[in-house]
Amino acid sequence: MLTDRVLATKEALVVALGDNWERYRANMKNWFRSRWTKEEFDAESRKILTPDKLHLHNQFLLALLNKIDAFAPLENPPAVQTSSSSGNRSKRRKRSCRTFAERLNFELSDVLDFVAEDNMQIIRPPTTIGIPSDQQQQQLQSQRYCAQELFLPDAGFIMGRFLIGAWEIGLVSVDDNVAEYVAMAVQVLLKDLLSAIIKKRKHYKTSGEGNFYYDVGAPLRDPSLRNTVTRQKVDDTPLELDKELNTANFMRRQNDDVTFLSACEEVQPTERTVITLKDCQLALRDRNLIGSHAVYSINMERLNMMMH
């Protein structure tokens, strides 16, 4: 339903613009690439539209934004309190439901508050020429995108870019499942990249067939030490319990085990260091992480430029 609305308003706008449709689409790309603000895009669009055609621009923009917002998860409204005389049990039930709803509808904090000052210049949005600094600070909330917010793109974010790209190459529309699939693929790719970087730095264990890894950061055991207390013995005979548990020999054996375990522990704690660009470069030497050669070469060039 929303897709049909977008296509209908888009066709009406194309007919109204005529040859200016390419210019309108280029302006929209500048807005989506955060080169322009929404106000700048709206101002440039009004220059190529007559006053009697402005409503088509507003209808198309509203339909497109509704299409993108449809991918956002719905917020559960807080539970409405109703008068009832069922006693304390119903009151406890209402209180628990209200607490659960409040837990879902939490308020997000500003991510930039938790970023070090050294990295603020990297993630700050680009300044707009000709706009005072006070107005730029007011437009900061509307100019922040995935690179500035440090969040992964969601399906709605991807859907808007897909529609512009599809119209640019002559396609009619994009299926809704494509945006969700790409958003999930981005999450899996980022997970694989982070896992590869961490596994290059830390020891880890794998399952029997080597398909799954776990216990990342486990200390590497000294092969010269043989821990007979915690070592698993598969071929051992059944354990024979001592009938006299309160004897001095039993207590002395427990103390010996504690001393032996303390001797097998690490003498120096593991030093924790920050992940650097060199770690990323070493991890990306595995060509199976990024299958596309174009994406791999571009990002490796950027990584090398940041290191030098």
UniProtKB/Swiss-Prot annotation:
It is found in: Nucleus. InterPro entries: Hfi1/Tada1 (IPR024738). One of its GO terms (cellular component) is SAGA complex. The keyword Ligase does not apply. GO terms for biological process: regulation of transcription by RNA polymerase II. GO terms for molecular function: transcription coactivator activity. It holds the Pfam family SAGA-Tad1. The keyword GTP-binding does not apply. Keywords: Nucleus, Transcription, Transcription regulation. Component of the Spt-Ada-Gcn5 acetyltransferase (SAGA) complex consisting of wda/Taf5L, Saf6, Taf9, Taf10b, Taf12, Ada1, Spt3, Spt7, Spt20, Sf3b3, Sf3b5, Nipped-A/Tra1, a histone acetyltransferase (HAT) module made up of Gcn5, Ada2b (Isoform B), Ada3 and Sgf29, and a deubiquitinase (DUB) module made up of not/nonstop, Sgf11 and e(y)2 tethered to SAGA by Atxn7. Not a component of the Ada2a-containing ATAC complex. One of a pair of almost identical proteins differing at a single amino acid position expressed from genes (Ada1-1 and Ada1-2) resulting from a gene duplication. Belongs to the TADA1 family. Component of the transcription regulatory complex SAGA, a multiprotein complex that activates transcription by remodeling chromatin and mediating histone acetylation and deubiquitination. The SAGA complex predominantly acetylates histone H3. This is Transcriptional adapter 1-1. The gene is Ada1-1.
